[in-house]
């Protein structure tokens, strides 16, 4: 059964159980909004008047991975120094890029490739933002997100802007005005984004001992009031608590309200307001074992939690936190939340398939969703599901170091967050980046994520309680992406395969990858070998292996042969590697070549085609 109570003891036993048949919340297969433009940090908003859904994402400049700062095609061709924007007029069945002449919006109103956000004012005007180095833009649309008639490419200097629509033609922009300082302020435009106030309302505090707090996350407006998440910061610079900042029109500054003391793993908490102005906050904690060190050199991570707390008085007081998600075998992180009618919320999060330091250790990342229709109850009922099933949307590490990730050649393709929202029916929409696809021409992995869109297809909506199985759009075949490549690549050592001298050992071979064939619902995936990895080890029965190192010497001790030291060969279809050796001791040796394809399928050793045994006497 997938119905679980929202207490820690009841929920720890099961993290992502299937919901019961009576409340079977289900989702569509991931739909690719675009097969060329980047999709990190995506958001959606529905326009009930123009019957459109607007989808926006980071353009990808600071999300590039493999090979570092190099901008491969098609990214370089499509670069516009603007956030990406699409609209759908058929409830998400198809998507169209906005703009003309190579721009997503008028460049005199929109500037900046990163940090998008969406909001709508009380007059129905939709706003977006982007950051270009240190300047935040605001631009807006009155036709459902298709064109942008108002805006300012330099509303104010700052970093990581968030928006909240106010009265007609009014929008608020929250941003960090100074790097390396708690400088969070909120600015205002009253003319659709054409002009912005230059004096902000602060929501940050630095204490004499260096501790403090800062506004940190998505901003919301309701009835002449603003509310946003805040993170509390200790004297060592780490997050040690979560809360909210609130403001009512005319106040000189925001007022901080702490929810609880806690560690944080993600960049910020997330909040949502339901139609009765109840406020919900979610965050991920970050327990670690300080007695152990992981492969990144940091403290060893432990299983963690997604927590939620509720306020019935617009953030002044908060309920005791409950656990929304937990697994003993992985990490849950980057939660987001959307609310509908009073007490009805959806929480989404990423989940790894193993305990890992995600900054440098690979894992398979999937999506989890918690559907809560009685969130105001003392013990809410949480129906959990996996919107993409066991399918991974990312198989790699997840760097959280911001712009330094690209410089250090770490994987930041997912950006810093993903989101859920509601369509015009009140059914849940999930927007995420996806790194599983490959270039249809070369078969190479994309250096950035692609935008995906997942729609609730069954179960109760968060508004009106309708069945989300009604009125579903039918996406096109091409939007569902490529077939899943489960076939491992093949490597063959070319005879004689091995050449050994007193100082060097050389291997050569060929490798190939079949990819997978298309179907009625999936596009084909071109096969591509990404790399060939080679290991050389002295083997001894019942003792294990001593692997050859870069120094040309063997490891000092025998250990499990399943943990090799690997060299990357030059070339892929035809490859070779020349390894230095220094005084190899006598004994039996084994050289193994393994190919890895663009879908991260890894070849296993065989005794015939990719393994050579030799002896040193």
Segments (PLM) and residue ranges:
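Aromatic/hydrophobic beta-strand junction motif of beta-rich domains
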Residues: 57, 349, 432, 507-513, ...
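Long, low-complexity serine/threonine/glycine- and acidic-rich segments characteristic of extracellular
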Residues: 484-492, 504-506, 512-617
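Bacterial N-terminal signal peptides
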Residues: 9-20
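Bacterial N-terminal signal peptides that target proteins for export
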Residues: 1-9
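Surface-exposed coil/turn segments at beta-strand junctions on protein surfaces, enriched
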Residues: 221, 274, 340, 413, ...
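Extracellular, repeat-based ectodomains that mediate carbohydrate processing or recognition
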Residues: 24-486
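A generic structural micro-feature
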Residues: 77, 300, 368, 412, ...
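Short beta-strand segments of immunoglobulin-like
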Residues: 494-500
């Amino acid at each position: 059964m997938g119905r679980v109570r929202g207490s820690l003891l009841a929920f720890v036993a099961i993290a992502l159980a299937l919901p019961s048949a009576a409340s079977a919340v289900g989702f569509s297969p991931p739909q690719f909004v675009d097969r060329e433009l980047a999709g990190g940090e995506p958001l959606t908003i529905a326009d009930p008047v123009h019957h459109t859904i607007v989808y926006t994402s980071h353009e990808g400049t600071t999300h590039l991975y493999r090979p570092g700062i190099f901008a491969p095609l098609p990214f370089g061709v499509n670069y516009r120094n603007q956030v990406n924007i699409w609209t759908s007029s058929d409830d998400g069945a198809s998507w169209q890029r906005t703009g003309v002449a190579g721009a997503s919006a008028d460049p005199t109103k929109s500037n900046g490739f990163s940090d998008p956000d969406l909001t709508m004012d009380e007059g129905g005007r939709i706003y977006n933002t982007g950051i270009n180095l240190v300047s935040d833009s605001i631009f807006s649309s009155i036709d459902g997100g298709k064109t942008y008639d108002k805006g300012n490419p330099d509303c104010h200097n700052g970093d990581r802007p968030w928006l909240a629509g106010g009265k007609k033609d009014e929008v608020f922009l929250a941003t960090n005005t100074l790097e390396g300082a708690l400088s969070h302020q909120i600015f205002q435009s009253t003319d659709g984004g054409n002009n912005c106030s230059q004096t902000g309302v602060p929501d940050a505090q630095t204490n004499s001992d260096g501790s403090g707090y800062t506004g940190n996350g998505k901003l919301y407006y309701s009835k002449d009031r603003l509310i946003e998440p805040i993170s509390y910061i200790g004297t060592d610079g780490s997050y040690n608590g979560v809360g909210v900042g609130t403001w009512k029109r005319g106040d000189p500054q925001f007022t901080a309200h702490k929810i609880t003391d806690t560690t944080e793993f993600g960049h910020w908490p997330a909040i949502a307001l339901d139609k009765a102005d109840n406020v919900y906050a979610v965050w991920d904690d970050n327990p670690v074992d300080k007695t152990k060190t992981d492969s990144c050199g940091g403290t060893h991570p432990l299983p963690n939690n997604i927590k939620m707390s509720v306020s019935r008085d617009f953030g002044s007081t908060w309920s005791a936190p409950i656990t929304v998600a937990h697994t003993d075998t992985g990490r849950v992180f980057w939660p987001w939340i959307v609310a509908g009618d009073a007490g009805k919320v959806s929480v989404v999060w990423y989940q790894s398939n193993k305990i890992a330091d995600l900054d440098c250790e690979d894992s398979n990342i999937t999506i989890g969703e918690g559907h809560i229709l009685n969130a105001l109850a003392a013990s809410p009922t949480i129906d959990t599901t996996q919107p993409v099933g066991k399918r991974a949307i990312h198989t790699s590490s997840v760097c959280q170091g911001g712009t330094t990730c690209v410089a250090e050649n770490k994987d930041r393709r997912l950006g810093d967050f993903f989101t859920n929202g509601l369509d015009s029916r009140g059914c849940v929409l999930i927007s995420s980046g996806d790194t599983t696809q490959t270039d249809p021409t070369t078969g190479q992995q994309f250096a950035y994520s692609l935008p995906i869109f997942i729609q609730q297809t069954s179960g109760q909506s968060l508004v009106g309680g309708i069945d989300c199985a009604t009125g579903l759009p039918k996406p096109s075949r091409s939007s569902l992406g490529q077939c899943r490549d489960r076939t491992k690549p093949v490597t063959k050592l070319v005879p004689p395969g091995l050449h050994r001298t007193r100082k060097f050992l050389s291997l050569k071979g060929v490798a190939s990858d079949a990819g997978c064939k298309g179907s009625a619902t999936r596009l084909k995936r071109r096969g591509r070998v990404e790399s060939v990895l080679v290991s050389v080890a002295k083997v001894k029965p019942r003792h294990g292996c001593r692997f050859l190192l870069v120094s040309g010497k063997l490891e000092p001790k025998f250990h499990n042969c399943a943990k090799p030291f690997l060299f990357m060969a030059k070339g892929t279809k035809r490859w070779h590697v020349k390894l230095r050796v220094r005084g190899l001791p006598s004994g039996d040796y084994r050289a193994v070549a393994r190919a890895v394809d663009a879908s991260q399928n890894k070849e296993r050793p065989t005794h015939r085609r990719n393994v050579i045994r030799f002896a040193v006497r």
